[in-house]
Amino acid sequence: MLVAAAFGLVACGYGEEKLSVSKDDPDYNGAVLFSTHCSGCHTLSAAGTQGSGNRGERTQGPNLNQREETYEDALFAIQNGGFSGAIMPQNIVVGKEAEEIARFVAKYAGEDAETSPRPGETSSSP
């Protein structure tokens, strides 16, 4: 029972007040669900989450501000507990909720990611 309570605390979100996604955004519900179910481990500014990296816990998930994700990869991670060697709980959300979170992550993840220039573009880095 203590383990379940501890997991519940880790999985608790920070609340809607920290979301930077407006209520009229089609991905708003995904942001709320991410904040509720994923904030204990993952950092993503659009959801107002800081993950566990700043607490030094083993449950630190990827900082999604610095990592781009596709819808397919995000949904796979939700359904399968992350990728090889991950400690993410499998199916923490399922069905429509998993799809809404995956859409939200695909849209907002990677806002701080360094990206390589595409062919024909030049890098803005010095």
Spans of features found by a protein language model:
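Sec-dependent N-terminal signal peptides
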Residues: 1-4
